[in-house]
């Protein structure tokens, strides 16, 4: 049986995107899909917006990991990005190692078996090739789903012609057949022309279990 690709656009710093990515990997174990992680950027998304100063500082700290992620995808491929993202998330989100993000990103390269010199892409240089690639990848996500959402963005179907939504936001990440059933439901919604949004307020924090 052939598998279909499900793309998930993430900012590596977003804990909710991390949870969604773990669900998608679980779903791939029980359904015939190939997960493909793509990169979007909370920093790009919030450029020019009037934000609370604390949130602005937090957002400005997300450039590096997103730059490195898109650079890995461009130079080493999707599978390498998946390995690095998992290594990064285990340290940054699960382990709570968030004091020196650049060091965490560098350690994740080693964990993922990737060249150490890739870390050079981490440092933000507006307008360089990595910056342009990050903005292009982010724009692809926004073109599919609209500009009033954040990360993650999930996309079903054939690339830019597919159907994309913000989310799903999950905590904890469903496992086993629960992960598969959630995927089934989302794919069913994506098959309905004219369906746009379904939402409820979160009642708890992040559960990384």
Positions of PLM-derived features:
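C-terminal cap of thioredoxin/glutaredoxin-like
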Residues: 23-25, 99-209
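Conserved acidic functional residues
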Residues: 11-13, 155
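Structural alpha/beta surface segment adjacent to cysteine/selenocysteine redox centers
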Residues: 12, 18-105, 185-189, 197-200, ...
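Extreme N-terminal starter segment of soluble prokaryotic enzymes
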Residues: 2-7
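Residue-level detector of alpha-helix boundaries and kinks
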Residues: 9, 53-54, 126, 171
């Amino acid at each position: 049986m052939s598998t279909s690709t499900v793309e998930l656009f993430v900012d590596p710093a977003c804990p909710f995107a991390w949870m969604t990515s773990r669900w998608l990997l679980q779903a791939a174990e029980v359904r015939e899909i190939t997960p493909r992680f793509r990169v979007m950027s909370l920093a790009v998304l919030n450029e020019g917006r009037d934000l609370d100063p604390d949130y602005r500082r937090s957002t400005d700290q997300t450039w590096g990991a997103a730059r490195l992620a898109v650079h890995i995808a461009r130079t080493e491929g999707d599978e390498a990005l998946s390995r690095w993202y998992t290594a990064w998330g285990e340290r940054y989100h699960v382990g709570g190692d968030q004091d020196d993000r650049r060091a965490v990103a560098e350690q994740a390269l080693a964990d993922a078996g990737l060249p150490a010199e890739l870390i050079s892409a981490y440092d933000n240089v507006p307008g360089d090739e990595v910056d342009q690639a990050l903005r292009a990848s982010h724009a692809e996500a926004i073109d599919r789903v609209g500009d009033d959402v954040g990360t993650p963005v999930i996309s079903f179907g054939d690339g830019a012609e597919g159907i994309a939504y913000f989310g799903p936001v999950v905590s904890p990440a469903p496992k086993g057949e629960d992960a598969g059933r959630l995927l089934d439901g989302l794919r069913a919604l994506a098959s309905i022309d004219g369906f746009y949004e379904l939402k409820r307020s979160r009642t708890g924090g992040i559960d990384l279990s």
